[in-house]
Every structure is written in C-alpha cells, then in structure tokens.
C-alpha cells in the first residue's frame, strides 16, 4: 500500500550552506587510499532487493582514491557468479547524523543499465528493516538520461510510501554539487544550489517519523535492476563515478 504525502516542489531557489552552520564531518579524498575510519563496504551479489547484476567488492579495482577523487568503478568481468563488479561504500557505524546540511561534488556516469547514487539510510535498518528505517536519495541517475532524481522512501500504514522528483536536463557527467538540507520540518534537495525537491516532515506528518532519526551515507554504482532495466550495454565498461568531496554542516 503506497501512501502519498502532501509535499511542495520548488525550482531554482538559491540554497547553500546555511548561515551559522559549521563543518562537522568531511572527506576530501585527497589521500592515497580510502579512509577506513570513515567508510565501510557492502559486499555481495544478491541483487540488493532490486535484481541488480553486479557483485559489490572491497577491491581496489572497484573503489580507490586517486588525483583528489574517490573513484567507484563498475567493471564487466566474471566474478563470484556475476558478470559485473562494482563498489558500494557506506558510513554506517562510522558517521551517522540527524539534521544538517550535506553536499557532495560528483561526476555521474551515463550508460544503458548504469545506476549511480548518493543516498542515505536510517541507522536502525538492522532493527526495523526497510522501508521503516527511511531512505533519502539525494542523487540517483539511470541509463543515458541527462537528469537526476531525488526521492524519499518510508513506511506508512504497514506499506511502502515514497515521493520523488526529477531535475531538468543537464550534463550529469560534468561535476555538479548535490546537496541536502534537512531539519525537523523539511527535507530539501538541490543541484548546484538550485532546489529541485522539498518534502514536509514536521511532527512526523504522513507517518514520516523515520526522518527524525540518524542516517548514514551510501555511494555506489549499480548495474542493471528493476529501475534502469536489464538491457545493459556491455560496451560502456569500465564506467565510473567520481566524487570530489562530501561535507556535512550543522548548527
């Protein structure tokens, strides 16, 4: 059962780091390796609830830091019974936060069947499962589209509720800043300081209480699946997402 929440959608509103907020966590990816104190890995090839094609690894071939960027690379190769490998990094158990302003500067890959994402899950996912834990998708892109999607998922009346919006068209392969403003009343998502999404969560309206807990980050590049489809172009690989930085600010 899907519940639709009343929301408002705004375009081209200037955003950015709110006044009085200070930097509380960041990764600039300027070292020679992924910071294990900040990032862990999801590993496996079970489809991740979406019938994805890839096997996520912790190998250097799929995720590494070089040239001031985090590289998450999807590769066509036979590995653990799968035809593709990639990486899914997360801050679960290392950095989790409630409310604030977060931004990441990212170059997003395009290609038929590719599915890069910068997103968040509630820290209590192991206790309450999904979607009760809540999910905030700051940036998702699929296939060869030149646009991105922002979506929230949660549980309402025993079922899955969601609300999403898409951006206008732009060259997602260039670096852009994807940001989240999140307080006790609203979730807002922007691209290059132009707001594309707003959802009201004040007082848990629409059964959105999950969004008043701590969340952690996830960065990944999936291959195939229920949303992008199963007609993957094998000639695009290797294909990678580059992340310049991630920063979190709070009052």
Regions found by a protein language model. Name each.
Residues 15-251:
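GH16 jelly-roll
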Residues 3-12:
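Sec-dependent N-terminal signal peptides
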């Amino acid at each position: 059962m899907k519940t639709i929440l009343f929301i408002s959608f705004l375009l081209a509103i200037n955003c950015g780091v709110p006044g009085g907020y200070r930097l509380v966590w960041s990764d600039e990816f300027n070292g020679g390796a992924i910071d294990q104190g900040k990032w862990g890995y999801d590993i496996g090839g079970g489809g991740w609830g979406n019938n994805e094609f890839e096997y996520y690894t912790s190998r250097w071939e799929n995720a590494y830091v070089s040239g001031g960027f985090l590289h998450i690379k999807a590769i066509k190769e036979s590995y653990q019974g799968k035809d593709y490998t990639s990486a899914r990094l997360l801050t679960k158990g290392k950095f989790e936060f409630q409310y604030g302003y977060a931004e990441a500067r990212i170059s997003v890959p395009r290609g038929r069947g590719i599915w890069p994402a910068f997103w968040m899950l509630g820290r209590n996912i192991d206790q309450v499962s999904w979607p009760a834990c809540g999910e905030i998708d700051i940036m998702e892109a699929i296939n060869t589209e030149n646009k991105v999607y922002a979506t929230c998922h949660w549980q309402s009346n025993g079922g899955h509720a969601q609300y999403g919006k898409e951006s206008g068209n732009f060259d997602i392969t260039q670096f852009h800043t994807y940001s989240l403003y999140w307080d006790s009343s609203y979730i807002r998502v922007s691209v290059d300081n132009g707001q594309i999404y707003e959802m009201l969560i004040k007082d848990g309206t629409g059964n959105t209480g999950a969004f008043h807990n701590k969340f952690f980050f996830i960065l990944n590049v999936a291959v195939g699946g229920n949303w992008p489809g199963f007609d993957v172009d094998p000639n695009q690989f290797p294909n990678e997402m580059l992340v310049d930085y991630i920063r979190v600010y709070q009052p």
